[in-house]
Amino acid sequence: ECFRPGMTDLEFQYEIEKRMRKNGSIGLFRAFGANMDIYMGSILAGENAETPSPFDFALGGGGIDASCPLGANGTLLKEGTAIMVDMAGNYTAYMTDMTRVFSVGRLTEEAYRAHQVALTIQQEVENATRPGTACSDLYNIAANIAKKEGLSANFMGTEQQAKFVGHGIGIQINELPVLTPRSKEELLPNMVFALEPKFVIPGVGAVGIENSFLV
């Protein structure tokens, strides 16, 4: 319903945002940390996914202005382009966070394989998620699978790789726990976190998945 041939990533995002608001999202993006106030998420199309960002998010994107270098930048959604939709909505005052990937036509086999690896990471991390599990262990599960599949250089970015694969979510989009290799925190009952294993394929775009889990 949102996509039309010839549109840009910005036009695609406007259509998604409109539907989010019409379905109850209040349009608030609340983040913890200085200079983390952005809009309702990001659309990363094609090579724009390779652009690093100063924000502490999984991936970057050039954005429409240097004052907010993140997300959609006017890229034309053409044949062979991967489109990562990472939009944050609300249920009452609580944040939601989900990522899905679409494509215009066929992508490269490497992109499809990397996306499947992201799904495998999600399943293996979910299997290991229980109270008492160390956040660093969950990150290492993800990183080791990426390494085994020869995709370490693409994992969580290329030019600038994020050093986490998941984060807590609640009133703010980025709460504890954070799934990083150096975290000493353990999961507690009823924690909620978003898991987002992603890969950037140069010349194609970003692939991967993001879903939220209750411990």
Where are these regions (language model features)?
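Active-site neighborhoods and metal-handling regions in enzymes and metal-associated proteins
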Residues: 1-215
